[in-house]
Amino acid sequence: MATLVSPPNFCAKEDAEALRKSVKGWGTNEKAIISILGHRNAGQRKEIRAAYEQLYQEDLLKPLESELSGDFEKAVYRWTLDPADRDAVLANVAIKKSTDVYNVIIEISCIHSPEELLAVRRAYQLRYKHSVEEDLAAHTTGDIRKLLVALVTAYRYDGHEINAKLANSEADILHDAIKDKAFNHEEIIRILSTRSKTQLMATFNKYRDDQGISISKNLLEEGANDFQKALHTAIRCLNDPKKYFEKVLRNAIKRVGTDEDALTRVIVTRAERDLRDIKEVYYKKNSVPLEQAVAKDTSGDYKAFLLTLLGKED
């Protein structure tokens, strides 16, 4: 379930006018920006942007980008984007940084539905005049490149049919490849990038039943390389995204110096989807409410905005 609290009735024109006053007056009114945008869903934000452009012949994103700063600006800017366009931006930033590129690309590729992933790929082409797979191929090499390109171009069956015989045979294929340390085996990439999530869950369950250990734990042996870590991330995203995102948040908050990029990414992308469920997983794992952990590690308008998206006013 979502944490976003948005009103059923709103006026896009009134919101656009209020936002104009917030960014064009004497000093930016950050509280007004948070109170409006932090309580509007994707459809409502799209209407506000359209109304703003019609009224002022300017995209709302431009004054937000120029008048706000730091982590607060980044969070508000990405939140205001259309979800598919936002993911295109996240993918491009990850690719260009070339560090931990696989985490963001795998999240987008493995957690979205086939239609959502297709929308992200279209948004990426429209924004950057390249395909995401083209840019990925240019900035990665070897087995990581093979895996990421296969995942980002996948269009999986999205139904609930399970082939038990196939789950059994592919659990054996995965076990043999891992046992032989053939982590770059083409069959692993084929299975992870073509099977439906329902089918993969059946395969992973069969693997655990047969081997007495989950496939994700089996991959993260001592000295695991980047490709093994990427496989592990893909399996976690496909199998249990809520637990995956809880760990991303935990790592972002508990590291020395908060990882604001990861913290912003999870809260902004999940607030309208399943952030309430992720909060529950976080509390069970850490015995601390996520809002409390975020409030302790952030400050100012950035903190206020994240807490608003988490459903808790500062």
From Swiss-Prot:
Annexin repeats lie at residues 10-81, 82-153, 165-236, 240-311. Ca(2+) 3 binds at residue 298. SUPFAM superfamilies: Annexin (SSF47874). The keyword Ligase does not apply. Pfam families: Annexin (PF00191). GO terms for cellular component: cytoplasm; plasma membrane. One of its GO terms (biological process) is response to water deprivation. Transmembrane segments: none annotated. InterPro entries: Annexin (IPR001464), Annexin_repeat (IPR018502), Annexin_repeat_CS (IPR018252), Annexin_sf (IPR037104), AnnexinD_plant (IPR009118). It comes from the Eukaryota. GO terms for molecular function: calcium ion binding; calcium-dependent phospholipid binding; phosphatidylserine binding. A pair of annexin repeats may form one binding site for calcium and phospholipid. This is Annexin-like protein RJ4. It comes from Fragaria ananassa (Strawberry). The lineage of its organism: Eukaryota, Viridiplantae, Streptophyta, Embryophyta, Tracheophyta.
